[in-house]
């Protein structure tokens, strides 16, 4: 069982002994300890797994530091988040070498190569946490599913500066005219009225 105790959510995934992936679980959380115990209990119930059948639990993520050496009596192994991101990216992509982008509360770039230690290349604080914070401040909403529904009915060209707004030759540059050139570019002081 692998558990990522992140800044805003706890994610759990595991494989059955025959190699089949169990139904993963994603739980929003503010308290890492409560989150990990509740999420693991729910995960085992939803996947019809007994705690005795879990050999070990791999724990990673910022909140993983709050998890001890065992969880519900099962041994825990703490793993570097960037190593987890790198190995997981290679597994999912079926590549031997890749730059893996992990988009969570923030965003991290990790270089991974089979048989080698993964390397953190850098990152940004812009991620899901940014979207949640902006949604709360600007819209008074925290539920991203509602924000996503609103976004689907919106029109980016009313707020974003598009390639077509700055050049008619975007296609000559390999850019589609309807691509965003600058997020929120039409709502800045220097932008013309949209």
Model region roles, listed by residue range:
Residues 27, 75-76, 117-124, 132-137, ...:
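Flexible, glycine/proline-enriched loop segments at strand-loop-helix junctions
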Residues 67-101, 106, 110-119:
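Conserved phosphate-binding catalytic cores of ATP/NTP-utilizing and phosphoryl-transfer enzymes
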Residues 40-55, 191-194:
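Phosphate/pyrophosphate-binding loops at sites that engage ATP/ADP/AMP, CoA/4′-phosphopantetheine
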Residues 15-16, 110-113, 137:
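Short beta-strand-to-turn element immediately C-terminal to the catalytic PLP-Schiff-base lysine
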Residues 1-4, 54-58, 98-102, 123:
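Short glycine-aspartate micro-motif
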Residues 136-194:
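Active-site rim beta-loop-alpha module in soluble metabolic enzymes
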Residues 1-38, 117-118:
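Short glycine-rich, Thr/Ser-proximal phosphate-binding strand/loop in the N-terminal lobe
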């Amino acid at each position: 069982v692998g558990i990522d105790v992140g800044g805003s959510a706890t994610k759990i995934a595991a494989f059955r002994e025959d190699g089949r992936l169990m139904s993963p679980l994603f739980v929003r959380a503010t308290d890492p300890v409560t989150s990990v115990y509740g999420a693991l209990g729910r995960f085992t119930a939803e996947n019809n797994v007994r705690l005795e059948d879990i050999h070990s639990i791999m724990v990673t993520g910022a909140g993983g530091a709050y998890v001890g050496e065992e969880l519900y009596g099962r041994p825990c192994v703490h793993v570097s988040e960037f190593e987890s991101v790198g190995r997981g990216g290679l597994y999912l992509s079926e590549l031997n070498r890749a730059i893996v982008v992990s988009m969570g509360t923030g965003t991290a770039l990790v270089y991974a190569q089979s048989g080698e230690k993964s390397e953190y290349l850098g990152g940004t604080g812009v991620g899901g946490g940014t979207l949640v914070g902006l949604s709360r401040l600007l819209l008074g909403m925290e539920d991203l599913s509602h924000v996503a529904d609103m976004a689907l009915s919106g029109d980016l060209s009313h707020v974003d500066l598009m390639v077509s707004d700055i050049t008619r030759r975007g296609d000559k540059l390999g850019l589609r005219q309807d691509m965003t050139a600058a997020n929120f570019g039409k709502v800045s002081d220097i932008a013309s009225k949209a």
